[in-house]
Swiss-Prot record:
Binding site for ATP: G158, E159, A160, G161, S162, G163, K164, S165
Active-site residues (renumbered): H143, K164, D182 (proton acceptor), R251
Family: Belongs to the HPrK/P family.
Superkingdom as given in the UniProt entry: Bacteria
Protein name: HPr kinase/phosphorylase
One MF annotation (Gene Ontology) recorded for this entry: phosphorelay sensor kinase activity
UniProt region (Important for the catalytic mechanism of dephosphorylation), positions on chain: 272-277
Domain writeup: The Walker A ATP-binding motif also binds Pi and PPi.
PANTHER family noted in UniProt: HPR KINASE_PHOSPHORYLASE, PROTEIN YJDM-RELATED
Organism whose genome encodes this protein: Xanthomonas euvesicatoria pv. vesicatoria (strain 85-10) (Xanthomonas campestris pv. vesicatoria)
Keyword Magnesium part of the UniProt annotation: yes
Any Pfam family hit: Hpr_kinase_N
Chain segments carrying region Important for the catalytic mechanism of both phosphorylation and dephosphorylation: 206-215
EC number(s) recorded for this UniProt protein: 2.7.11.-, 2.7.4.-
Amino acid sequence: MNTSITARELFDQQRDKLALRWVAGPKGEHREIQAGSNNARRPSLAGYLNVIYPNKVQILGTEELAWLDSLDARQRWETIEKIIQVQPLALAISKNQSCPEDLRAAADESNTPLWISSKRGHELLNHLSYHLARTLAPRVTLHGVFMEIYSIGVLITGEAGSGKSELALELLSRGHRLVADDAPEFTQIAPDVLDGTCPELLQDLLEVRGLGVLNVRDMFGDTAVKKNKYLRLIVHLTRPMTEPTPSGYERLTGDSGSRHVLDLDVPLITLPVMPGRNLAVLTEAATRLHILRTKGIDPAAMFIARHSNLLERRTP
């Protein structure tokens, strides 16, 4: 999924938090940053003023403005030209410092957004870098019900009619929490982290066949919903055409594997859906088993090791 953010969107999203004022270049509000650039050297999203390797958002603190003031007239004009020519998303001046008139005029003439903030430079840098990195991170929408089970994020998947929503409803009644139904969005915010959230349209809602759309927050309370959660496990529901006959090894380890999501391989456990099976209990057990495995505890491996040791002791 391609993502981008414009200068206007960034300003509106951070205006209150960073006490931003737009002082020049209002016509540049449609400038944008695109995610997934294939440039040999991608510019930093935000950083202190750098003329050689310009950032997409150039921050001018006390030292940067003092450096501009130290230049003679020609050097200052050439430097401002270089700052403007690369078409940054915006220029941001920290600590409510006065904006140099020549910089303001250049920003207006080139339609370069120029902001002033009451925050210190490092606060601007931290907030803008984090917000831009998260907004422009790779993201994907998956079909399923995303829940928090025993404090970890579990995505329940399966074909239509496999019982995902009914399972989610049973898990909610057992004290677990809903993040998103039907179309959770996952963002890779770190090399090994997928953060799952719910689209605004579907917030707090769960669709169950025969009952229609339910408001989970109203039915189960505020604690039954969760704003976001890191994806750690996928539980896939499948309806076998015949009674499954797992091999001996599968009976020991279960039907485990992984699913590739963005750049990560997420652990996956497959549960056959058959009459009489308590899927809520099985899903809870699968989650507990995954937690144990992440701690290095594998009951199947322990059993195989015990069995091997027993055979070795009995071998003459």
